[in-house]
Regions:
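Generic structural signal for alpha-helix termini and adjacent loop/cap motifs
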Residues: 9, 36, 211-212, 224
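Conserved CoA-thioester-binding segment of acyl-CoA-metabolizing enzymes
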Residues: 1-20, 36, 239-248
């Protein structure tokens, strides 16, 4: 619901997600003991046809379809779904105190939140397998080395840095251009041929090239001023969008 509301408000340009206190998210609450992962005790999963949908996957799939930048500012330990949910973000930064653990196999379960799709694309298949097989906790510095995160910051500076990064993403760019670009790049992961990307890029170039935003982008450059893009995500997306078959 939160992502729906943000997407419906043209005044909101991006999302920053962080934790409260010393940790980001420690994953599942293990207080139920041996019944922690029993489907009968899961109040968040959704039944669909012949299977029960993982709640983490429902969240990351909504993030995947989101039309605005998502930035994670990991302020502390992120374990289980606390780590896997961040993979659907566009940019992840972390504090020096952050830790990441894909500990699912250690608990006798498997990766959730579509992380078997996201993680190999971010860190590579071999590193993804190593992290999920072993479940070992990695530091923010190792996370940076494997491109799981983009940068490390002092805890007291983390949110300010996240805001600065976000402003760099959105301040000079047209919201609709960002929305289409986000979907083009994410969805190109599953395309088998660059021609598929060429088709969408061509349609998008034609649509955007004829838009008021494109005129404003050129005029603002020539006039050496900041652009004032007026096209809105809620009302001015191109006719060919979405170009993919919608899933739940």
């Amino acid at each position: 619901i939160a992502f729906d509301n943000i997407e419906a408000d043209d005044n909101l340009k991006a999302v920053i997600i962080s934790g409260v206190g010393r940790g980001f998210c420690a994953g599942a609450d293990l207080s139920s003991g041996k019944d922690t992962f029993n489907p009968s005790f899961d109040t968040f999963g959704v039944k669909e046809d012949d299977f029960r949908r993982d709640a983490g996957g429902i969240l990351t799939l909504r993030m995947y379809k989101f039309l605005k930048p998502i930035i994670f500012a990991c302020n502390g330990p992120a374990v289980g779904v606390g780590a896997s949910m961040q993979l659907a973000g566009d940019i992840r930064i972390a504090s020096e105190d952050a830790r990441f653990g894909f500990v699912f196999a250690n608990r006798g379960i498997v990766p959730d939140a579509c992380s078997s799709w996201f993680l190999p694309k971010i860190v590579g298949i071999s590193k993804a397998l190593e992290l999920t097989f072993s479940g070992r906790i990695i530091s923010s510095h190792e996370a940076l080395d494997i491109s799981l995160i983009s940068s490390i910051h002092k805890s007291e500076n983390l949110m300010n840095e996240a805001i600065n990064i976000t402003q760099e993403l959105i301040d000079k760019s047209a919201p609709i251009s960002i929305a289409i670009t986000r979907q083009m790049l994410w969805r190109s992961y599953s395309q088998s041929d660059p021609y598929d990307a060429h088709v969408i890029e061509s349609k998008a170039m034609d649509s955007r090239g004829a838009s008021d935003d494109a005129k404003e982008g050129v005029n603002s450059f020539l006039e050496k001023r900041s652009a004032m893009f007026k096209n809105k995500i809620t009302s001015d997306m191109p006719d060919f969008f979405p170009w993919w078959k919608e899933s739940n």
